[in-house]
Amino acid sequence: MQKIKRFELKMPKFLLAVEPKRMPNGFHFIYSPHYLSLILVIRERTQQVALNDELVHKPHKLYICNEYEQFKLIIIQNNVKLTGGELAPEISETQFLDEAWQWYNTNMIIQE
């Protein structure tokens, strides 16, 4: 008799969200189904970006990967405070950006 393997399907905390035809290289979106929030990732080595008035006031943080690479993460759609406690624990926007950066750095950046 064949043994059945059980697999627990869990909602991922972060997903890479891409608009392939519209997004130039150096930009990605990260979506969090737990917090119903969207983050824009800007690779600053390849993109020089001046944030408009709307984006300047959104929560953002700069992460330095190494001496050549740095990334700016900006919360574009922010439901972190509204959804905290429902699908995930309550956290600050800075903690949310740090967790998103950790996920992005681990899964999307090729370490050399």
Q: Over which residues does each language-model region extend?
A:
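Short, mixed charged/polar active-site loops
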Residues: 37
